[in-house]
Amino acid sequence: MEITALQAWRAIPQTRDIVDYFRGIFDVIGVTIEETGEELTIALEAEQIRIDAGLPENPDFVVPLKWENVENMVSHAEDGQIDSHESWRIVSVLFTSLTQATLYNPIMASDIGRRISRVEDLAHVYLIAPDGHEATCHTLAYLKKQWLVIPGLYGKPKRTFRMTAEDSIEYQRRVFSAIKNNSFREWWRFSRWYKKWRKTVSVKH
């Protein structure tokens, strides 16, 4: 009998390094597997990552995966640790889904939110591999009071971001914290941090 994604991922060692790697990136996500039609819930708990069949009722976001992504995750985590190259491989899979989930938040999509953070309405974003090559990329476009996250590069950007996996994870943890707490103070703190962080990972045109 062929192994399922649920069985494969439940066999991954639940080390502190593995659990802490994902802490702050999400609380609960849904995962769909293209080839098998499986739907899974991935929930971060105090000491472990819980993996159940079926999609959660209120996921932070849903990630569509292929079977090769399932096998790669097993390979990345089989030694109980995630190195920089493995981190890049993981983030490159989550990259667009993470961006969509955070930018679709009402605060991030509002004109006020954009003005507070001084976010341009058209940007190109590159995820840089450990060897320095530009790998995954997408376009962020603000149109009719909503963000569009489009795989690939389109239009003439007003800003270009070039981020490592570590940069992307730091951003996700900061913005996810602001979304969870959802207070003026948290969003103000995020805005101040973002404007400083942006200078280290982007160029304005």
Q: What are the roles of these predicted feature ranges?
A:
Residues 1-205:
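Feature captures hydrophobic
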